[in-house]
Amino acid sequence: RIGFDPSWLGDYRFDIKFDWDTAGNSIEFGDFEGMPKWQRRMQIPQQNIRDAIISMVSVQGDTEFASVEQQNHLLATAPTEYDKKSALRIMCEEQRHGWQMAYLLCTYFGEHGVREAAKLLERNAQEGTRILGSFNAPIDHWLDFFCFTHFIDRDGKYQLKMLSTSSFQPLAASMGPMLKEESCLLYTSPSPRDPI
């Protein structure tokens, strides 16, 4: 459903990446501060917390896949080869982030997680079925793309930083590599007041 020529990917690989060192071993905030981070679903002490983590992972994955669906048609009308390659790299990394979230759901949350991961692939931005409305809006031309990514990628950086302190260690460990890749996304539209 991404819709671009696979040969454009070059040697890019959709690997699952973790940074366990940066994720830390202790919960940093809240009622469970100082306790070991949860590494498995059944270590999470309350069902409402498990549900909230599944929801956060699902929304994050949904936005990653949605942005690729929303923007991939622009590759055919890129103003320059540099713009095309930059947009393609953004789309590859966003797609990888979506796969990372699907991996977390399938690996750590049993049948419920598998169902939620399947929904990530069933929803589609062109059909207007993504969770967040801004990812269902059409991106019709490159000016839309530049403006959208300028603001959304900055918001995404703060969202990933927030998730990097998750009490669920696999989610926190996913954020280090995603933040490194997000810095490339931000580089495509930095402003003097927003250091990367």
Residue ranges and their predicted role:
Residues 1-85, 107-139, 143:
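Terminal targeting/low-complexity segments that flank the catalytic cores of oxidoreductases
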Residues 91-115:
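Carboxylate/His-rich catalytic cores and anion/metal-binding grooves
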